[in-house]
Amino acid sequence: MKKHIGISLFFMGCFLSLSATNYFVATNGDDSNAGTLDKPFATLQKAQSKVVPGDTVYIRGGEYRIREEQMMGGDHLRAYVFEMNKSGTQAKRICYTGYQDERPIFNLAEVKPEGKRVSVFYVSGSYLHFRNFEIIKTQVTIREHTQSECIYNQGGNHNIYENLAMHDGFYLVRGSHNLVLNCDAYNNYDPVSENGTGGNVDGFGGHPASASYTGNVFKGCRAWYNSDDGFDLIKAQAAYTI
């Protein structure tokens, strides 16, 4: 049943508009290219700058070693590697997905902003669909009580996160009607925070900061070998379905 749900959501979300544009990102791409299958972009940042509602970004397989100078934004507390602030619509989602059966991997080993929490995908946009990729080696640089996250949903509504593997977890504070489907969060530990004990990293954190942030769901997700909780709802001000 999980597979059928995922496939139907993918076709509803990513292939609804036949007039939409498809962009491609590849490890051997170049951001001066046109972003086509034959001439792909090199970075997700470039593709994100081009998309409009209904578009799909196909990420080719391979390992993408992200550099610190590629970070898109941040604030006094956080560094945003990919700032996903563009929104789709109910009828035309924006999709970011691994291409066909390929499995892209985003490696964050080199992103270590001093004194900042790392949010690899900082998602404030709505009606987005993220599918079929992996995020590894998300770094923690603060020795106090803290953590970093692979995905941080901060204000985005009606987003779908599907078939993702995350080595530093998922975190939601603001947003409604977001679906996390068939995702894995595992081996989440860092040797830096908590004065070197690294015991504060969860697999999935569902912490809606307001009673109005309703309709959020973890479905078919797995969490294991995490240094803190597999699923943490300790600060949730609204019901969260698991």
Predicted regions and their residues:
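Bacterial Sec-dependent N-terminal signal peptides
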Residues: M1-T21
